[in-house]
Amino acid sequence: MKRKKITIVGAGNVGATCAHWAAAKELGDIVLIDVAEGIPQGKALDLMEAAPVEGYDSVIIGTNDYADTADSDVVVITAGVARKPGMSRDDLLNINAGIVRKVTEEIVKYSPNAYLLIVTNPVDVSAYIAYKASGFSANRVFGLSGVLDSARFRTFIARELNVSFEDVISFVLGGHGDDMVPMVRYTYVGGIPVEKLIPTDRLEAMVERARKGGAEIVNYLKTGSAYYAPSASVMQMAECILKDKKRILPVSAFLQGEYGESDVFSGVPAIIGGDGVEKIIELDLDDEEMAALRKSINSVRNNISKLG
């Protein structure tokens, strides 16, 4: 039986950590590709030399040649410029748009049947670019958004209540930016609505912290951005495809009438399985929640309109 093949584009902190998660989860063989000579090769060799210690059997190679990525099942695109203190995800728009377009064209040439998972910020716009550049069906291109944003929100709730992280379930909708919409009404702790456990003012503070979660880490690091949680989140998405897990996850998916929106990517709950985004789930939103989602999606549309 042939192993699955995962290509990770970009050998920076996010990409290399994605490769580590993929190997640790035994998701398949891994290709780490980057324009910088020596970086993907060195990191791939380092990761493979950890295999005897960690007990995985993934073959990991580093390369600068897209021919080595041929016939990939899943491609994770992390390539791009990282945020610096004071920058928003949207500030990266024009720089990263060209990178994502070029990478996508190379990937399609060698892996026409792959699923594309987009991490490059601003994620929702990058996913739109990759979708248009690839010519793939909408189910095969989606971005990291709500899995990461929800993980941050869940972390803050679990720490507030001193309970297991696993017992907190939540969704974050909308674009992966400052207008994201943490869904307090759909947040549960061990099956109990979170609003029954945490006062409103504390919840509002956690919502705001989740929105600024990436910037908080950027401000600490000074010269980089988050990578452990983003890479863990996107590899959870990859695992759902490769193992046909059919989990309901909030991802940046292409909307075709759902939530009254079309021709735009936004974070929404979806069933993720062997066929990628198999179904987008439409939550029953009240007027305030829908208005917040519309505002978030309009921010994504505004950025798309700025593309050259």
Curated annotation (Swiss-Prot):
Protein name (database record): Malate dehydrogenase
Domain of life of the source: Bacteria
GO BP annotations listed: lactate metabolic process; tricarboxylic acid cycle
Binding site for substrate: 83, 89, 121, 152
Active site, renumbered: 176 (proton acceptor)
Alphabetical list of InterPro entries matching this protein: L-lactate/malate_DH, Lactate/malate_DH_C, Lactate/malate_DH_N, Lactate_DH/Glyco_Ohase_4_C, Malate_DH_type3, NAD(P)-bd_dom_sf
Family: Belongs to the LDH/MDH superfamily. MDH type 3 family.
Entry function: Catalyzes the reversible oxidation of malate to oxaloacetate.
Enzyme Commission number(s) of this protein: 1.1.1.37
Keywords annotated in UniProt: NAD, Oxidoreductase, Tricarboxylic acid cycle
UniProt-recorded Gene Ontology molecular function terms: L-lactate dehydrogenase activity; L-malate dehydrogenase (NAD+) activity
Reactions mediated catalytically: (S)-malate + NAD(+) = oxaloacetate + NADH + H(+)
SUPFAM superfamilies on file: LDH C-terminal domain-like, NAD(P)-binding Rossmann-fold domains
Xref: HAMAP family: Malate_dehydrog_3
Disulfide cysteine pairs (residue numbers): none
Endpoints of the signal sequence: none
UniProt binding sites for NAD(+): 10-15, 34, 96, 119-121
CDD domains named among the record's database cross-references: LDH-like_MDH
